[in-house]
Amino acid sequence: MPLNKDIKKVLVIGSGPIVIGQAAEFDYSGTQACEALKSEGIEVVLVNSNPATIMTDKEVADKVYLEPLTLEFVEKVIAKERPDSLLAGMGGQTGLNLAVELHDSGILEKYNVKVIGTSIASIKEGEDRELFRDMMNRIGEPVIKSEIVTDLTAGLEFANKIGYPVIVRPAYTLGGSGGGIADDEEQLRTILESGLQLSTIGQVLLEKSVKGWKEVEYEVMRDSYGNCITVCNMENIDPVGIHTGDSIVVAPSQTLSDKEYQMLRTASINIINAVGIEGGCNVQFSLNPNSFEYAVIEINPRVSRSSALASKATGYPIAKLAAKIALGYGLDEIKNAVTQKTYACFEPTLDYVVVKIPKWPFDKFFGADRELGTKMMATGEIMAIGANFEQAFLKGIRSLEIGKYSLDHNKFKEYSISKLKSIVMKPDDERIFALAEMIRRDYMIDRINKITGIDMFFLEKIKWIVEEEQRLKLSKIEDLDKEWLHHLKKKGFSDKAIADMLKVSPDDVYRLRDIWSIKPSYKMVDTCGGEFEALSPYYYSTYEQYDEVEVSNNKKVIVIGSGPIRIGQGIEFDYASVHCVKALKKLGIETIIVNNNPETVSTDFDVSDKLYFEPLTEEDVLNIIEKEKPDGVILQFGGQTAIKLANFLKEQNIVTLGTTADQIDMAEDREKFDELLERLGISRPKGKGIWSLEEGLEEAKRLKFPVLVRPSYVIGGQGMEITHDEEELTYYLENAFAKDSKNPILIDKYLMGREIEVDAISDGENILIPGIMEHLERAGVHSGDSVTMYPSQNISDKIKADVLEYTKKLALAIGIKGMINIQFIEFEGELYVIEVNPRASRTVPYISKVSGVPIVDLATQVMLGAKLKELGYGIDVYKEPELVSVKVPVFSTQKLPNVEVSLGPEMRSTGEVLGVGRNIKEALYKGFVGAYMYPSKEKGKILATINKHDKAEFLPIAKDLASVGYKFIATSGTCALLKEAGIEVEEIRKIDEEEPNILDIVKNREVDLVVNTPTKGNDSKRDGFLIRRAAVERNLGVITALDTLRAIADVELEKFDENKDLEVFNIAK
């Protein structure tokens, strides 16, 4: 039992939906913490609104509540479960803020719940900018000259006093939200207004900018007896001024002298002792590169993105140990899981280099402002391990899946040196390639060091890589001797990079390696630099020393992971990979995971029998397959990242379980797929590929507007649009053909129908559909951005029977063994197929949890030859549950400047929440509250600007909202419509009219909700865009689909916010 005998039942708060700044790392830390508590015999109650996580599986905690993370709902859970303790530091900023609110509102005291681990007082000292600064002054730790402000005037006065540039850091926000660097008064006004609104306590710290100093982080652990250790120190290649989540980070630090290292280590220990941390904590410093002067930037008094990285970089499980410390254990009483001999009070030592590179979402958002600053914009990250910096760095570049295998980037070849210089000085996501191009043109690296603040050590390494690339370009394959090739491999060059420079194929380089037997050896991550024998099967490749892998003769399967989190391919795929591994283990099969994402559960070293932390490229994966010789490889659960390897593995004669390359081709190749549907007698929306504007207008006439247009090769609906007339279509096609004239544009009849989706399992004879899901928004909104309902609410028995029949026909005709995802449209009583994915999709975790069918487990067994009839869940459609569950998308558009907010066929959401209720309206209410979409309890003002196609549909919704007390403000057209219907409305001037106009009332937050249905193709598109952006940046709700507004109105009519009897449901029953 734990040392503190009073702890029997602990409430753990999760981090909610995935947003930029708070991603899968909290699923990893939360899962670890729950398992650590359970291993001590403690009852664990979990509340988290995110259904896509492993953490919310019924095996992870004893009671699981997928409920909104708000005071009212968490209080309901506490009242029902009566936990004696609360563990706050596992749910990121969301969990921390909620714990502070529960304490301040008296709820914890009312139910007699103690906070274990880091106390609320310590959290406040770490998070409240003023308390933290005062404490630093008390213990003599230097902080940057700063001022706490709570209004605009005080901020402008302070900036004038200390001089620009100044850094703005709001209190209690996530990923630097609302912060930034202001170079002048105008910029400061904008950033400060946003920061004061986003801070939960309306407090912002303004500090003198030390842009250009080094940024260094220490990950520190402390127990309640005051024992402290530093787990890992990390150095950002990018200097202060770029958020650490958007920086390339290296561990351990490469450029600190021993004196600097010890000085900052001592400071971190002083700080966490003073704050009184019990558990893990991250301390960030800025260090003057030219002296020993340093300053404390901030601390995170909880597990964080950096602690997930430190855990994976060292093999030291920070979250697990933080949970044990919360129970009263000391660091000297907890065994190191990797060595089983040493204790947690041993500081890890690293005999390798780790590099983390962020993954940004700009491929989804062409118009976005890509400049990096103190506000985080990356959705995910990759990590790479190497024997030296160059190796880890080049592995990292090819792990990003941006089609780059070296530092050579065609885009920058055309740029002038002055243009390259401006990119490097105002960095964006591609700055590293611009920097390499400058070096390629013999720009002096000491001058690059002066303009960027990047340390000479890193610039020298990058220069070496660029020089080798140039040397290869001037050589032929005959010039490549054994020594040179071996040296390039040691430094991380891939076969493809070498081949591209030599203008030969990667196979040619591979053959040379084979002849000279230049093969990778795999080293173990062992926490102790090889001093003790390690038991962790956690490996990375190098071309250096001897091999540490023991290859068994057992039956074994390799599961390919999904790589970094991005829009369209999120944590859902990690969920599927982990469940696949668990299913294989139950069958007694040795499991091996290959993945490169440090935030996820799949890369926790005790999930699989072996973990290879490697890039998911053809070469890196093949090396592991050749080493391990598995009985099969599973690609179905790793999203597009894994599916992309199918053809390559087929060419190498490697067995893939479940889906084959030919089956993928049949579903993804438009012509083959059309032929298949024709043969099976299944309808799809009419359409074809067109090659010119004239042909497009002709086809649209034949199909009749509206039509759906999109480029032919896309993922996540990139570049799709619905056009309503010739003007809109012409505008789209002119732009599309200007961007790419080599491929056709697909044009389909747009059916304004109901969208239906299924994830099914097929064994080649029968299929099982765990549940038929219905989308709330009509077709045309990407399935990942739609509210999804299960059981379906409006689908007739006839259509359900058609869904089953079509799914069965398709699965059997394609020859699926395992998973298939199909999307349908029901239009005027007919069913049409719009898309088939022969793999797990992003709805798998949701439908698994709400139907109770362990989809991935069953699909894995089927891939290995089991039949559905033997597995205990029947065939065809599984029985529907009593409760209704909705999945509501969550967006991070606020964090990405200049990005479109309106919903359409291109996916934009980063995460999701679940709402569970006795009926659909109850479920929707909880879903909207959990996704922060529910308008305020005080029925406020709605700003409505509705386009001409939508006015008739908008009117009855407006009447309902007016009946519960909402007031309307609208521009002339919508205003006339509402007045005529007898709805009270105030008219507001349009953007191009005199002030105060529509934009001013949004900027001054004089409304509570903006309803704007976008028009396309003309200038009002820009007006609508400006209004939507202004609203999102000021934390106002924005709704662009009337189906969503209809649902909100239905929920409002029920007056749930006055109803105190809403139940919370434990889904682990």
Curated annotation (Swiss-Prot):
Entry binding sites for Mn(2+) 3: 823, 835
Example GO biological process: L-arginine biosynthetic process
Pathway(s) annotated for this protein in UniProt: Amino-acid biosynthesis; L-arginine biosynthesis; carbamoyl phosphate from bicarbonate: step 1/1; Pyrimidine metabolism; UMP biosynthesis via de novo pathway; (S)-dihydroorotate from bicarbonate: step 1/3
Cofactor binding annotation: Binds 4 Mg(2+) or Mn(2+) ions per subunit.
Chain spans, region Allosteric domain: 933-1069
Domain of life: Bacteria
Region (Carbamoyl phosphate synthetic domain): 550-932
Residue numbers binding ATP 1: 129, 169, 175-176, 208, 210, 215, 241-243, 284, 298
Binding site for Mg(2+) 2: 298, 300
Residues at which ATP 2 binds: 710, 749, 751, 755, 780-783, 823, 835
Free-text comment on this protein's domains from its UniProt entry: The large subunit is composed of 2 ATP-grasp domains that are involved in binding the 2 ATP molecules needed for carbamoyl phosphate synthesis. The N-terminal ATP-grasp domain (referred to as the carboxyphosphate synthetic component) catalyzes the ATP-dependent phosphorylation of hydrogencarbonate to carboxyphosphate and the subsequent nucleophilic attack by ammonia to form a carbamate intermediate.
PANTHER family per record: CARBAMOYL-PHOSPHATE SYNTHASE [AMMONIA], MITOCHONDRIAL (PTHR11405:SF53), CARBAMOYLTRANSFERASE FAMILY MEMBER (PTHR11405)
Protein name, UniProt field: Carbamoyl phosphate synthase large chain
Organism: Clostridium beijerinckii (strain ATCC 51743 / NCIMB 8052) (Clostridium acetobutylicum)
